């Protein structure tokens, strides 16, 4: 109560921020007459003037009023569009390292031109990040004339572009692209084998469009570049045959359950667990199928991989539903993004889940993958010196933006007042009653020529509503992952009088639904439209526009509540743009996932007390409040998951930054001989210490063991025992020096054969290749550690602290292994002629190229809307170390083309 009173008196933090910025808006408005007097050339010359002022020491912030006034004037001349005052406010918020919440239709794309221009003046580059390739291309092409008028270059970063084109895009002042592509380019740059292969510059300023989708919805999914691991597709097929024999337990509480269930499903945490009865049955079935020996336990250490297959198959059958979580198209399982409803071509679930779903659907099972490099969006975007974002729905997630990204959220007022009517939710007992009520609502709207947008949370639901509308004889369009190719056309005409559009969450984010339909789309459909035709189309559109306004504007129907209030608000936000009329209503049933899992008992108890009859709906503030509480519960749980993921990933992130910094230093130098000499000393010291402990008696020395180790690991034949016999005066220190001196002499003789330049080149290649190989293994080890670390909680230990401690030990061990492997490899290389070194270098390059190919996406989709573990694959079968070499020599691969020496 007191807080509300103080807010009324002094204003909220948001009000105070906007009040401060409005003073700057007044200054910009005062400059407008002065800017209007400038010729085009004088206006263009302002860019060079601003850059010169920055070089002399002025700050970017000091240029805001003048730079914004220049962009506004340029926009008037190039587009015929003048930035509203609220757009100037939005531009200042974005420059201030904040999230700008701007409602749908308020011109976020035009607003972004202000901070993009201002921050590009420094010459360090600006990245404008969008959720899909279509929006990146559209926004870049739309804004290009304005930026080029002001002397700025614009680049577009798209998947599948060759490296030179990408480098050119990144070298531009302003680069448009998707969050995925920026992230993958960062990972690929840190797998490059020469500085010329890198494409990105230093990460300076990122302006993220639909920031809630990218930094929150996708924060739990890391970007992963992976290569093929061993083939185990047959095992997935065998285990898949067993799963249909298992019965799902009716209740999750197995202690009180007396029925016949073999596994329980926890829908909240999306986990499946075998019951005691289920374990006994599955062991019997595995023995019967010849997969496991009689008397063995599924939980024995020898069967860990088998347990992994069983768990993956159970999850595939019990938790993942066709046309909800994925679709099957052209014999391929394609993931559907739960937040946007878009297909995510080329993406694959990790931990064998994708293979288990492929086995379930009877399509070809593709190989599992091994992580080569990974990063979360949370950690990628925190690498930028300056980060800002904009969206129509951010205020509900303001706490998360602040605590994780240190970004404040500022709600920018609308240019015109919002007059959309948001009606209370209607709750029905059953799904069938709810669908019937939705159909009746649509009939009423179409009867008065009011356009309707029906929002669903899955493809399955959108098709269910579509079938009912077809039965009722109502014409409609369906916009979901199966028909996304027509997205732009469907969204463009969704505001037509009486139009009915069913959409999953993809609902054309980034594309406005114009009341009366889009006259621009009609003009674009004509080959060579005359001015008369354009005027005719505009006049017809005006009639339709007025007709729709009279009918009440666009009506939004939500078929169920999403887990997040923000995504419900996004659906509502499709209506009521720029002060237009509109309305919205959500229809719910007790069978909806959210109600069933989080709110069922309380709400269904209320409904029973009210004595509801079939077909009746409840519309009460208590129910709306209970649903909002259920959504808050889910949002809070999801926030905790994202926060926990970040805390664990922060540990890996510190290591990633250290490795990538070391790798980039390596790439940028041509001579690593000093480093090699230094680590050679360290490696030989550790090796000798293992057999000749420091300050020990001669009786404690293991000379035969040391000689064998030097021979096996460093290819050094040293008669150490002979030296000691012939020279009794040799003591521990002089012996160490002699071993190291001998090793250096042997290495120098190799260098004399091939030449110093070639050897330096080869040393660098070996260091890079060894670093990449060990980092890849370290990532896999960190994954395994992460999966089991929660069990330390049972021993009264903090899992996070244990993870930090163990991962640090593993990282330190990896760095020691790196030194050892590099020195060992370089010592064992047998060279007689320069040509042989060239051949070895060629082999290393071929391996690097193979990895580079694996990083390319196997499929591209312009509409892909961001992260999930992406496995970039190659069609080639991986050659095992002990397989015959493909060259036909008859030798094992490891002894032929798989060797380094």
Curated annotation (Swiss-Prot):
It is a peripheral membrane protein. Its cofactor is Zn(2+). GO terms for biological process: intracellular protein transmembrane transport; protein import; protein targeting; protein transport by the Sec complex. InterPro entries: Helicase_ATP-bd, P-loop_NTPase, SEC_C_motif, SecA, SecA_CS, SecA_DEAD, SecA_motor_DEAD, SecA_preprotein_X-link_dom. SMART domains: SecA_DEAD, SecA_PP_bind. It holds the Pfam family SEC-C. May bind 1 zinc ion per subunit. This is Protein translocase subunit SecA. The gene is secA.
């Amino acid at each position: 109560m007191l807080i509300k009173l103080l807010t009324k008196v002094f204003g909220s933090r948001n009000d105070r921020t906007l009040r401060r910025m409005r003073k700057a808006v007044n200054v910009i408005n005062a400059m407008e007459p002065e800017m209007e007097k400038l010729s085009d050339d004088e206006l263009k010359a302002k860019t060079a003037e601003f850059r010169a002022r920055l070089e002399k020491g002025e700050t970017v912030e000091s240029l805001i009023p003048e730079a914004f006034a220049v962009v506004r004037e340029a926009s008037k001349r190039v587009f015929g569009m003048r930035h509203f005052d609220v757009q100037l406010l939005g531009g200042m918020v974005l420059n201030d390292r904040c999230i700008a919440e701007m409602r749908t239709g308020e011109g976020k794309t035009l607003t972004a031109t202000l901070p993009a221009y201002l921050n590009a003046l420094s010459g360090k580059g600006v990245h404008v990040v969008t959720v899909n390739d279509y929006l990146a291309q559209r926004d870049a092409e739309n804004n290009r004339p304005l930026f080029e008028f002001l002397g700025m270059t614009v680049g577009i970063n798209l998947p599948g572009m060759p490296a030179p084109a990408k480098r050119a895009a990144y070298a531009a002042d302003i680069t448009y692209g998707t969050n995925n592509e920026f992230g993958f380019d960062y990972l690929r740059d840190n797998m490059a084998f020469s500085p010329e292969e890198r494409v990105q510059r230093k990460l300076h300023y990122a302006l993220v469009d639909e920031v809630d989708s990218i930094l929150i919805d996708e924060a739990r999914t890391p970007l992963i570049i992976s290569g093929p691991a061993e083939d185990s597709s047959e095992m997935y097929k065998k285990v898949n045959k067993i799963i249909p024999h298992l019965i799902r337990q009716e209740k999750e509480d197995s202690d009180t359950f007396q029925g016949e269930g073999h596994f329980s499903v926890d829908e909240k945490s999306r986990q499946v667990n075998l019951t005691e009865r289920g374990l006994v049955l599955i062991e019997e079935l595995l023995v019967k199928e010849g997969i496991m020996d009689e008397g063995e336990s599924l939980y024995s250490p020898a069967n860990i991989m088998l347990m992994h297959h069983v768990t993956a198959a159970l999850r595939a059958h019990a938790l993942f539903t066709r046309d909800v979580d994925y679709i099957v198209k052209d014999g391929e399982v394609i993931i559907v993004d739960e937040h946007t409803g878009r297909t995510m071509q080329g993406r694959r679930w990790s931990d064998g889940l994708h293979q288990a779903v492929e086995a379930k659907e009877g399509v070809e099972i593709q190989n599992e993958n091994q992580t080569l490099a990974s990063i979360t969006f949370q950690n990628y975007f925190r690498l930028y010196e300056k980060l800002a974002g904009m969206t129509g729905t951010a205020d509900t997630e303001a706490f998360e933006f602040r605590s994780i990204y240190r970004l404040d959220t500022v709600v920018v007022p609308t240019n015109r007042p919002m007059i959309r009517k948001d009606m209370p939710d209607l709750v029905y007992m059953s799904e069938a009653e709810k669908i019937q009520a939705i159909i009746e609502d649509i009939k009423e709207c179409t009867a008065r020529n009011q356009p309707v947008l029906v929002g669903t949370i899955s493809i399955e639901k959108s098709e269910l509503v579509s079938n009912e509308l077809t039965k009722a004889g109502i014409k409609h369009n369906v916009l979901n992952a199966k028909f996304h190719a027509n997205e732009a056309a469907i969204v463009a005409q969704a505001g037509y009088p009486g139009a009915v559009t069913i959409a999953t969450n993809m609902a054309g984010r980034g594309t406005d639904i114009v009341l009366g339909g889009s006259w621009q789309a009609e003009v674009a459909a004509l080959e060579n439209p005359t001015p008369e035709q354009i005027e005719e189309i505009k006049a017809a559109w005006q009639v339709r526009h007025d007709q729709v306004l009279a009918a009440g504007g666009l009506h939004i129907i939500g078929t169920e509540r999403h887990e997040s209030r923000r995504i419900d608000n996004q659906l509502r936000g499709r209506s009521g743009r720029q002060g237009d009329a509109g309305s919205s209503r959500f229809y719910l049933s007790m069978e909806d996932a959210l109600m069933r899992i989080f709110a069922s008992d309380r709400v269904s108890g209320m409904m029973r007390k009210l004595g509801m009859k079939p077909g009746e709906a409840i519309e009460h503030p208590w129910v709306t409040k209970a649903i909002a509480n259920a959504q808050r519960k889910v949002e809070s749980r999801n926030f905790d998951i994202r926060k926990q993921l970040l805390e664990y990933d922060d540990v890996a992130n510190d290591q990633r930054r250290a490795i990538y910094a070391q790798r980039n230093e390596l790439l940028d130098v041509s001579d690593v001989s000093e480093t090699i000499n230094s680590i050679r000393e360290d490696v030989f010291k550790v090796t000798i210490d293992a057999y000749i402990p420091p300050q020990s008696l001669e009786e404690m020395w293991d000379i035969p063991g040391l000689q064998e180790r030097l021979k096996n690991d460093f290819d050094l034949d040293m008669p150490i025992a002979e030296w000691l016999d012939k020279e009794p005066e040799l003591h521990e220190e002089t012996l160490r020096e002699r071993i190291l001196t001998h090793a250096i002499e042997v290495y120098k003789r190799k260098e004399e054969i091939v030449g110093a330049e070639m050897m330096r080149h080869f040393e660098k290649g070996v260091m890079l290749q060894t670093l990449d190989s060990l980092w890849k293994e370290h990532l896999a080890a960190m994954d395994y550690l992460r999966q089991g670390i929660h069990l330390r909680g049972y021993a009264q230990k903090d899992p996070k602290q244990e993870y930090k401690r163990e991962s640090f030990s593993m990282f330190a061990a990896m760095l020691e292994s790196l030194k050892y492997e590099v020195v060992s490899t370089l010592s064992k290389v047998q060279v007689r002629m320069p040509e042989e070194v060239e051949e070895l270098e060629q082999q290393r390059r071929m391996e690097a190229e193979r990895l580079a190919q694996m990083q390319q996406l196997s499929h591209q989709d312009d509409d892909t809307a961001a992260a999930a573990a992406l496995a970039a694959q190659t069609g080639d079968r991986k050659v095992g170390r002990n397989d015959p070499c493909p060259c036909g020599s008859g030798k094992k691969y490891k002894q032929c083309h798989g060797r380094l020496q």
